[in-house]
């Protein structure tokens, strides 16, 4: 998108009050049964924002009981027309759009996310995803099947029931919507556990669900699930061939790693560059990383915020030290930044080899590692030599090479001459240890429905 086409970004709200800090069950706010609370912090300043009620087993039981009750045959939720269900989900999208500035400010304060990214990318994505799911609500249907014999056979797509949904801290609002949008569209009820580091936007959305005013259930809690879809971690390969548009590859690979301080499951964290362009690619990547301005993510002009918390911050610094000790060349960064908040300098390593910790472990931080390859077969083998398989990138002007490599890579998503492009229309999920099942798109709806086959004996079929 060109700068001239960028929408205006408002100024973040100041003196934000966090009024929703309780557990939301059966359209009502509750204190925890135990009386326990936990603090929620701003990772840029380390200040406490508020305290949130801490859900425990008894709270979970209450939430699941309420969600089961709402799913009973004959309940208002089960007897509601599918088109009305879609209208309610669209209404929730309207309310999120209304509160977009508030939610973006909250997401930035609680999660360390750049305000501009929260406002444009995260909130924009949430609204589009909900509207996409709303459109599916009255289009989830079965088929008639020409079974042998005098039978009439059809299938029904039925909701599976109560869905337990656990939200990660790196994209708390986006992941909440990815979970509840398709689940509710299919007619399920949900029990949601936001991440303890970033619960505030989920709790605000609960208040909007109450405002919508229908039988949609949410709560902070855990559930034992009989059926599981998991979108887990990754150590995603990004392969740059010598015939690629070098500047475009540098920029996409850079954003593929450094977006949201590297705290993305799809981060392009194993960067393979063909030998003949390796040195130039490293040079341009280092120049790009050095342009960052670090600081409070609510401040205009800042383009890198803090890591989520102290634990993650220390883990990343430890992995950076391992890279230095194991012989990778530190090109820039390599340490903490500032005297307050969990900031880490944008870091680039070259001369990285496959056996180093930084090449094998998911860092989840602003640490780019650039490796060299010589041949097509070699890089495919190395790219697939991992327990993960969430995503991958390929940069080449050769369409035959792009198709060959994308077919060979063991990844749920492969981007060619781009990286990190996601849409509500397209399925997302991983191979191997990066999870099972899919989210988004029509495939994502399948995770929230059961197929029932109904066969009726008839006197004579007329086929």
PLM regions with names:
Residues 1-45, 70:
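Hydrophobic face of amphipathic alpha-helices that form TPR/SEL1-like repeat modules
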Residues 31-32, 37-38, 54-58, 244:
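A short acidic/small-residue loop/turn micro-motif
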Residues 45-51, 293, 320, 325, ...:
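Conserved C-terminal structural/oligomerization subdomain of aldehyde/semialdehyde dehydrogenase
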Residues 141-248, 373:
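Rossmann-like NAD(P) dinucleotide-binding subdomain of oxidoreductase/dehydrogenase enzymes
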């Amino acid at each position: 998108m060109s700068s001239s086409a960028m929408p205006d970004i408002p100024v973040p709200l100041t003196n934000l009050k966090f009024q929703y800090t309780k557990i939301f069950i059966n359209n009502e706010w509750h204190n925890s049964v135990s009386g326990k609370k936990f603090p929620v912090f701003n990772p840029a300043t380390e200040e406490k924002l508020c305290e949130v009620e801490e859900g425990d087993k008894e709270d979970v039981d209450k939430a699941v009981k309420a969600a089961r009750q709402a799913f009973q045959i004959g309940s208002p939720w089960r007897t509601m027309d599918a088109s009305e269900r879609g209208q309610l989900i669209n209404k929730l999208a309207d309310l999120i759009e209304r509160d977009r500035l508030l939610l973006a400010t909250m997401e930035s304060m609680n999660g360390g996310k750049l305000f501009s990214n929260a406002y444009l990318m995260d909130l924009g994505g949430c609204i589009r995803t909900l509207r996409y799911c709303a459109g599916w609500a009255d289009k989830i249907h079965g088929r008639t099947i020409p079974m042998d014999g005098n039978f009439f056979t059809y299938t029904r797509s039925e909701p599976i029931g109560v869905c337990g949904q656990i939200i990660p801290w790196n994209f708390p609002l986006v992941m909440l919507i990815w979970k509840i949008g398709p689940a509710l569209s299919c007619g399920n009820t949900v029990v949601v556990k936001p991440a303890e580091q970033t619960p505030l936007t989920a709790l605000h959305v609960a208040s909007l669900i109450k405002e919508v005013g229908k039988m949609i259930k949410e709560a902070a809690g855990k559930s034992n699930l009989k059926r599981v879809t998991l979108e887990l971690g990754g150590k995603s390969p990004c392969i740059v061939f010598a015939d690629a548009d070098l500047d475009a590859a540098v920029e996409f690979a850079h954003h593929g790693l450094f977006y949201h301080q590297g705290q993305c499951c799809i981060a392009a964290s194993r960067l393979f560059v063909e030998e003949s362009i390796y040195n130039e690619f490293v040079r341009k990547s280092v120049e790009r990383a050095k342009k960052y301005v670090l600081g409070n993510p609510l401040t205009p002009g800042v383009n890198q915020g803090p890591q989520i918390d102290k634990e993650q911050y220390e883990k990343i610094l430890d992995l950076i030290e391992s890279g230095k000790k194991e012989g990778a060349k530190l090109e820039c960064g390599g340490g903490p930044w500032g005297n307050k908040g969990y900031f880490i300098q944008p870091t680039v390593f070259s001369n990285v080899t496959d056996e180093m910790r930084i090449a094998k472990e998911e860092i989840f931080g602003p640490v780019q590692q650039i490796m060299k390859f010589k041949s097509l077969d070699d890089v495919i083998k190395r790219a697939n030599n991992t327990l993960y398989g969430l995503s991958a990138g390929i940069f080449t002007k050769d369409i035959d090479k792009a198709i060959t490599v994308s077919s060979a890579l063991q990844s749920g998503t492969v981007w060619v001459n781009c990286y990190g492009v996601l849409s509500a229309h397209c399925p997302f999920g991983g191979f191997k240890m990066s999870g099972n099942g899919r989210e988004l798109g029509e495939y994502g709806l399948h995770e929230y429905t059961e197929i029932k086959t109904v066969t009726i004996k008839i006197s004579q079929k007329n086929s």
